A protein has these predicted regions:
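Mixed-charge interfacial surface used for oligomerization/domain docking
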Residues: 1-7, 11, 57, 66-86, ...
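Generic surface-pattern signal
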Residues: 29-33, 53, 126, 195
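N-terminal glycine-rich phosphate/adenylate-binding segment common to multiple enzyme folds
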Residues: 43-71
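A short glycine/small-residue-enriched secondary-structure motif
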Residues: 20-25, 48, 53, 75-80
């Protein structure tokens, strides 16, 4: 895993290496200036060169090309490795990106080549959904995704956006009043996907449900229970990312 760099007050940090998630969110709450970046080409090539001393091939799974330039950077660098580095753009992020890594590991253990793994993961790129809700509209406003006026109205009316990722970009799914309604909207969307888009996977027992959160474990555990009520018998994997 290569950490993603970000800048706070113009000082660079590495995710999970030089700053913990708790420290990051504490600085975020204090409105310290934060910007994101991507791993440098030199760091990425150094990692690949190190791995290729012990392995024949690499399957590199970056964030979705629609959400980060790190994917196109990796693809450009991989050209010089004559096929030994296969970069997968299967439009995944967060828990679905993690699942792609686990799937790639399973395929490698089954004897698939790096090129074969890339094709399988790419062919399955639309076989996932992410639904996200946010506590505040402040960061959408700061990132330019909504106007200050829309953020102000949303705050006054206690509107909570529900966002979705089905493909390469983050899109609006619904706007509801309060977090309770936002969670209900996500559960309804998940149930609909289960019964329509992923019906065949569900009937074959090949579905995977995951929940993620940021700095709110207690609330995330409660949401996990709500998911289990809708999908009894399903194991829910938890990741400390965002309440999603």
């Amino acid at each position: 895993v290569i950490p993603m760099p970000f800048y706070i007050n113009e000082k660079m940090y590495l995710e999970g290496v030089t700053l913990t998630q708790e420290e990051f969110y504490e600085k975020l709450k204090k409105d310290e200036p934060i910007s994101t970046s991507q791993p440098s080409p030199a760091d990425l090539c150094d990692l690949w060169d190190k791995l290729l001393r012990d392995y024949e091939e690499i399957v590199h799974i970056p964030m979705s090309s629609g959400l980060s330039a790190s994917c196109s950077t990796a693809m450009g660098l991989a050209i010089d490795y004559n096929g030994r580095v296969q970069v997968v753009d299967n439009q995944r992020i967060s828990v679905t990106q993690r699942q792609s890594v686990m799937d790639a590991k399973m395929l490698a253990e089954a004897g698939k080549s790096a090129a074969e793994i890339k094709k399988i993961l790419t062919d399955q790129k639309l076989d996932s959904s992410i639904y996200i809700t946010l506590d505040t509209l402040k960061y959408l406003k700061k990132g330019g995704r909504i106007t200050p006026a829309a953020a102000a109205i949303g705050t006054v009316l206690n509107l909570k956006p529900v966002l979705q990722i089905q493909g390469e970009k983050l899109d609006a799914y619904a706007k509801v009043r309060g977090k309770k309604q936002a969670k209900r909207a996500m559960l309804k969307a998940m149930k609909n996907d289960w019964e329509t888009r992923f019906k065949e996977y569900a009937s074959d027992g090949e579905m995977c449900l995951q929940a993620a959160y940021t700095g709110n474990l207690e609330e995330a555990e409660e949401f996990k229970k709500e998911i289990q009520e809708v999908f009894p018998g399903m194991e829910i994997h938890m990741d400390p990312l965002s309440l999603s």
